[in-house]
Amino acid sequence: MIITTTEQVPGYRVKEILGVVSGNVVMSKHLGRDIAAAFKTLAGGEIKGYTEMLTEARNIALERMMKEAEKLGADAVIGFRYSSSTIMSGAAEILAYGTAVKLEKI
């Protein structure tokens, strides 16, 4: 499966647009991470616990989006993007989305 942020895939043309596909996940902070983060913000620098949590969330959202595209029989997802939002205090949603398409080699 090809995933690209562009609207075209070099060497291919879009044969059919199958529709918008998405995958999301809501992750919450962990109390231990919050305590460590509070100390880290005083000293400055990367908060590795949150970085790891967001990386995991992006990977889960991407995987879910790809599964949705595969169910439609897509060869690729074009116009791929991530979005994030705060759902409630201490919880964030990561959304992966794009357009599922069938490709034809040119």
Curated annotation (Swiss-Prot):
Q: Which domain of life is it from?
A: Bacteria
- InterPro entries in UniProt: UPF0145_dom_sf (IPR035439), UPF0145_YbjQ-like (IPR002765)
Query: What SUPFAM superfamilies does this protein map onto?
Result: YbjQ-like
Q: Which family does it belong to?
A: Belongs to the UPF0145 family.
Q: What is this protein called?
A: UPF0145 protein TM_0763
What species does this protein belong to? Answer: Thermotoga maritima (strain ATCC 43589 / DSM 3109 / JCM 10099 / NBRC 100826 / MSB8)
